[in-house]
A protein has these predicted regions:
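N-terminal glycine-rich phosphate-binding loop and ensuing alpha1 helix
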Residues: 2-73, 80-82, 86-91, 103, ...
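Predominantly late transmembrane helices and immediately cytosolic-facing juxtamembrane segments
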Residues: 209-256
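Short beta-strand segments
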Residues: 10-12, 65, 117-120, 149-153, ...
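Hydrophobic packing residues within well-ordered alpha-helices of enzyme cores
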Residues: 19, 74-75, 187, 209, ...
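A conserved mid-domain beta-alpha-beta active-site/ligand-binding segment of alpha/beta enzyme cores
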Residues: 195-204
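Conserved beta-loop-beta/alpha segment of the NTase-like Rossmann-fold superfamily
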Residues: 82-169, 211-215
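A short, charged helix-loop
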Residues: 166-193
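Conserved small/polar residues in nucleotide/adenosyl-binding loops
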Residues: 259-260
Length: 260
């Protein structure tokens, strides 16, 4: 069945100001072949992440959500088999995630009841990070809750992450609250209260996000949405979806994670 493979979308390009546009000198970094492989070759961040996902799940369906000007380079690095959801305009994470979700259902013909994970394109982590995402996908497909996030066990009171406060210390817990990126003192306070770093990973069934999308956007399918994309409001996924969901789950990841 399709249920036992991981659907994962790597958010790049037009999905947020931090990553837009990738063609600027400081942001072409995920394409630069500066990482050493075990056998001494060099690879880019994108190639490394792609290989890691397939080590964790050889049958994974990997899609990159990005701007049109990056598509050729992504195909060059990952081959023609990589799926690309092209964003025709610079919007925020909600439109990007909705467009990619519609692409999976309407273009790739993935069952809307399947689960998908959205992840930034540039996590520097070991394979266990992607194994945790795979496990989150399997979990959310079997429970009534709609949305799962990944929480990283903090190693220091960093100011660059948002924080997730879980209700319990279990591997998987309901979320009690979210905290915006804090200053150092508040970060330490959050950590003392058991907060986790928000890894920026969202896991949900495609049907869930498309239902929410149709409540906020008037469109019939992927092709219609693509045509209207330039008219969409800029709105973050957190603001459009996360803030309105009552029961959000967080899964812990105890390993190391850096966003390059």
């Amino acid at each position: 069945t399709g249920r036992d493979k991981m659907n994962i979308v790597l958010l790049s390009g037009g999905s947020g100001n931090r990553l837009w546009p990738l063609s600027t000198p400081e942001n072409s970094k995920q394409f630069l072949k500066i990482l050493k492989t075990d056998d001494g070759r060099t690879e880019s961040m994108l190639q490394r992440v792609f290989a890691q996902i397939h080590r964790v799940d050889p049958s994974a369906v990997v899609t990159v959500a990005t701007s049109a000007d990056q598509a050729a380079e992504i195909h060059r690095q990952l081959g023609e088999a990589i799926k690309i959801s092209i964003e025709p305009d610079k919007k925020d994470t909600f439109p990007a995630i909705v467009l990619a979700s519609s692409y999976l259902v309407d273009v790739l013909q993935i069952d809307p009841e399947e689960t998908v994970a959205f992840c930034p394109v540039d996590p520097f982590a070991d394979d266990s990070f992607f194994a945790t995402i795979r496990d989150a996908c399997a979990y959310i497909s079997s429970v009534q809750e709609h949305l799962m996030l990944l929480g990283i066990t903090p190693t220091a009171p960093l100011e660059k992450y948002g924080y997730i406060v879980p209700k319990a210390e279990n591997d998987i817990s309901l979320v009690a609250s979210f905290k915006e990126k804090p200053d150092k003192k508040n970060a330490q306070r959050y950590i003392d209260n058991g907060a986790l770093w928000n890894a920026g990973v969202f896991v949900f069934k495609l049907s869930y996000i498309l239902k929410r999308a149709h409540e906020l956007i008037d469109f019939s399918d992927y092709y219609d949405l693509f045509q209207k994309y330039h008219t969409l409001e800029r709105i973050s996924f957190d603001y459009a979806v996360v803030e309105h969901e009552k029961d959000i789950l967080v899964k812990r990841y105890n390993g190391c994670l850096l966003y390059t």
